[in-house]
Amino acid sequence: MLHRSSFRRLLTAAALASAAIAFPAAAENSKGFKLSDPTGDDKGPGTYTYPTDAVYKPGSFDITDFEVVPGANQTEFRVTVRTRIEDPWDSPAWGGNGFSVQMAFIHIDTDHKKASGVQDGLPGTNVRFSEDEAWDRVVIISPQGATRVNSEVGLKAAQWKDKIIVPKVTRAQGKTLIAVVDNAQLGGPPQTTWGYQVLMQSNEGFPDKKDLLTRKVNEFEGQHRFGGGSDYDNDPHVMDILVPPDGDPAKKQYEILSKYKKDTKEP
């Protein structure tokens, strides 16, 4: 169990909002840290629903734990969800990593300095970070193979390619997504001052021309579309994020991801 006094900073992604609040995040020790997230909050701003196809099992996008395990030359990131991770679309057949529907973005703020990082989320997430919590690195955990992910980054996020990390190893084990990253890509081994935020999304093999392999959220759910959002494409395309453990974490998440202009094409 983590104690509040030992928590590290947690970045709070605000959906197309001008500011986000800084919170402590994860506990420090010689082996890294583990942060738990409440269950049952895989609803984005509180209204989102899963696609209707049976492959999107309840809990598939519900983060329960985030863990960072540093090593001498590489770091392992682990994102655990509420249900066992499966591979219904046979990812090895298309060069994938052994799972199909989940995708996670791990944002890292290494300095907490204004204007030193990126405030915008990756294309298709529709989120924005506050100026003093802009991310300096982001690790993409995708079922798509590295060649496909790097190609998408080059086409849709080339301006940030030096900050985007495609892991050397991506795999799933039980309920956990695992990414192994060279510390050199992070700018060095993880530090106790770093801040983190994880966005849980869904892998879309046929994304919108501007979206980086992300699945859209519409007003009504469909076979392969989340529902409960907006068809104007200005809502956050995020099912779950990390929130601080004090108070009502789910309520805080819903507030954060509700900060967008509804029923309009304007952000």
What are these model-derived regions, one by one?
Residues 2-12:
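Bacterial N-terminal signal peptides that target proteins for export
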